Amino acid sequence: MKLFDTKPKSDPHFLYGREKELELLVRYLKQNDWIILLGPRRIGKTSLAKCAITRLGYKSITIDARENNNFEESLLKSLKHHEGSFNIRAEVKAPHLPVNLGVDYNRKSSAENLSVMLKKAGRLIVLVDEAQWLHNPRRVNMLLSYIYDTYYDKITFVITGSMIGVMKSIVDPGARSPLYGRAITKMEIERWGSSVSIGFLKSGTKEVGLEMNDQIGLTIEEKLDGLPGWLTLFGYNYAHIKNPNAALTETIKEAKKVVSREMKNIGDLGIGLERITEILQDLAKEPMRFTDLLDSTGFSNAVLSRHIDTLERLGYIEKDHRDEYLISDPILAAYINENP
């Protein structure tokens, strides 16, 4: 079961529906370009990045900001374990590395530690996954700026995430940002259309010895909003349950749990979960114009604009041709309706 494997893909043969994006990303990386992959969760950013790295055959390390939101610590530990980078044992100090990597280190020595390790790393791609959850944006940008200026010819970053938290400061650095003026290429990864989604479901079900007709495929695509991660999860469940309706029910149940965790993460970031939730509750009832949301929420123009911007960057809402905002993810809408 390859297409319906729920882990991020690393073999380009099983990266469905992203051929153009893969070729573009590979071309950028060959040029040593630093890349930012933007898009909502479950869109396939990690798989795209890993497959591009595989295609090139470069060595790589991965930092998952969901597991550790301290960028310095994660980068140093990943480099320490990178094969051929710097061969030391945990809890042992090495010459010219004035810090014990098994415990805390101080900021003054971090640049020296990185310098020693990066010099030994060789040609390397660093994948920073879901970077919006990293803390201390300025410190992250300082380290990225240092690596960019010093090791651009050998160290390349691929950074994935949605446009919240530290990602916003990386994508749109202000004039006072350490990253200001550095050339970093942005790629936005979009949802699949119906034809691609149904084609994926048909190919995946054929692989596991099951069938999928267009009508059922279209229903699943609409319920799961063309997000590859949700469609893959459906396929995984379908391969085990054998019943498409039961598999869809189970997938939606699991997807709502993921949304719940995302909402908690938004709260942990301190970017206004209560007000964001209030906006989503209104939009879960019906699409609304900005002026209608002003009336229903009672927020000031500036406050509403700020939170609308956050929701758009998260990929949670969008504006339609009637200039009305609506929740773009049906899973999110269902979750909001069930958790008023």
Regions found by a protein language model. Give the residues of each.
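Helix-loop-helix "sensor" segment of P-loop NTPases
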Residues: 170-222
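Alpha-helical DNA-recognition elements
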Residues: 55, 237, 310-314
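C-terminal leucine-rich, beta-strand-based interaction scaffolds used for sensing/assembly
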Residues: 266, 272-340
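A short, basic N-terminal segment
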Residues: 1-35, 40, 165, 331-340
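P-loop NTPase nucleotide-binding core
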Residues: 31-125, 131-134
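Amphipathic alpha-helical "lid/sensor" segments that cap RecA-like P-loop NTPase cores
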Residues: 203-261
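Short, Lys/Arg-enriched N-terminal segment that forms or immediately precedes the first helix
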Residues: 7-10, 253-269
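Sensor-1/coupling segment of RecA-like P-loop NTPase cores
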Residues: 133-134, 146-176
